[in-house]
Amino acid sequence: MVYLDSSSLLKLLWPERESEALRSHVATEEAVIVSSLAELESEVQLKAAWLAGRYRGSRWRQFRTKLAEFRDTDPFRFQSLPGAVFQTALRQHRAERRTHCRTLDRLHLAAMEELNVSRLITHDANQAEAARAMGFEVLMPGVQVTP
């Protein structure tokens, strides 16, 4: 089981350099958790890109349809988050020896804890660093990691 954050979820919707490697990796997983946070954040990013003129309304609707189709596609498992995720995020933030990360990234890490998932697929380097500092396994399909 692995948690898919919005940076990676978006790469499954529109083509980017890492998209093919990500698709191939996702196909090998038994369960890919998509939280309500990742779904919301992805929807917001899709709409923002449309409103900024990156693509037409018809393409935006196609992206939203594809995202909705993931709900009925293996290996995706869409999960709602409990309200406790905010307290978990605050506790993580306040903990000593943790790497700083942005609020939404912190909420993804709290979601992982709340959903009892220890593996993360992300394409966000800052979030990856914070996740590793917390002991999570981080996967970044298609990204060359330099030692």
Residue ranges and their predicted role:
Residues 1, 109, 113-147:
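Acidic, PIN/NYN-like endoribonuclease modules and their adjacent C-terminal/linker elements
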Residues 29-32, 75-77, 114-120:
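Short active-site oxyanion
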Residues 5, 105, 124:
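Acidic active-site catalytic centers that drive phospho-/nucleotidyl reactions
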Residues 39, 68-97, 105:
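Acidic catalytic patch
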Residues 17-20, 24, 70-78, 128-133:
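Noncatalytic, solvent-exposed loop/strand surfaces
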Residues 1-40, 45, 49-62, 134-136, ...:
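Short, well-structured N-terminal submotif of metal-dependent ribonuclease cores
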Residues 8-9, 38, 85, 108, ...:
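Alpha-helix capping/helix-boundary segments
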